[in-house]
């Protein structure tokens, strides 16, 4: 144990000397990582022997020492191959060769002369992100292990470099906009220059949506849904026969306008929440369960013919996530939404613990503003629709 403690002290003393020296020579950085590797190997062995302390040093868990030793080996080998290149005579400091620099995008490359790039998604300061564009990037050829020095570049699409005539993106603003933006637009601020970019819609159905309902952060798809229709032939238009229905009908049943398709999450179908309606005496509601197909329209909205309907959003997901989200949006009440329900579940199910929270809006415009300004957390699914207004 005493021998191990002496060796560990000598290793740590060497590390301190390298930190104080603050050299800019590559051979000193290789020596530094060799000592880090040796230190973690000794701590790993000490833990295997059941030791929790070696002198004044606490011995970490085996997995911690092993992971740090593997990282040190990886960086040391990369620096040793860099030492054999034409760039070994350049200045290399501890900061240039640290693990954080090695793992920063683009990963497994060495970088120098970084500058900040500010990207404002949707043109909003509330949705801006800062990225690092590198002046020079040192890329290793995976076949020959040789290193190549290429300039880092930035444009409206992202951060990238060109190696052997191939563009390699390490930050894609289009992909980032799916996380931080809504409308698919962003501004790139770099070195006093502003680059504007307008992106295409995320999905084809969003691209063909009508102008009166802007894009939302929800990916949409078209799905057939049941829609109320009248029993009489007049509701189907002149010259067309009424489709077969599966409901009790009467001659006094009211007519309804043509149904529209609903917005749903891709790969899932959710029926429109049923609402209770008072039907006049002697009248019976009639529903047609035909599939709705209209290739000339791609407006994925709920069909509704009730004048007393209000736009809503049903949030579906984990109960705790819903509660946190409801608490977070309370400050927007009466501005971005009118009412919000408590967390609710479907009764008599198959044991599914999925929860829901319903938000009411005074208008479709208010709901659109809500979707534009409020980001729906990951794990929650937003289901826009309509419900009958009741108190």
UniProtKB/Swiss-Prot annotation:
Disulfides per UniProt: none
One GO biological process term: DNA-templated transcription
InterPro entries, per the entry: E2/EBNA1_C_sf (IPR035975), Nucleotide-bd_a/b_plait_sf (IPR012677), Papillomavirus_E2_C (IPR000427), PPV_E2_N (IPR001866), Reg_prot_E2 (IPR033668), Regulatory_protein_E2_N (IPR036050), Regulatory_protein_E2_N_1 (IPR042503), Regulatory_protein_E2_N_2 (IPR042504)
Gene name as annotated: E2
Protein name: Regulatory protein E2
Pfam families: PPV_E2_C, PPV_E2_N
Function comment: Plays a role in the initiation of viral DNA replication. A dimer of E2 interacts with a dimer of E1 in order to improve specificity of E1 DNA binding activity. Once the complex recognizes and binds DNA at specific sites, the E2 dimer is removed from DNA. E2 also regulates viral transcription through binding to the E2RE response element (5'-ACCNNNNNNGGT-3') present in multiple copies in the regulatory regions of the viral genome. Activates or represses transcription depending on E2RE's position with regards to proximal promoter elements including the TATA-box.
Major localization listed first in the record, in broad terms: host cell
Region (DNA-binding domain): 309-391
UniProt keywords, alphabetically: Activator, DNA replication, DNA-binding, Early protein, Host nucleus, Phosphoprotein, Repressor, Transcription, Transcription regulation
Biased composition annotated in UniProt, kind: Low complexity: 200-209, 221-235
Post-translational modifications: Phosphorylated.
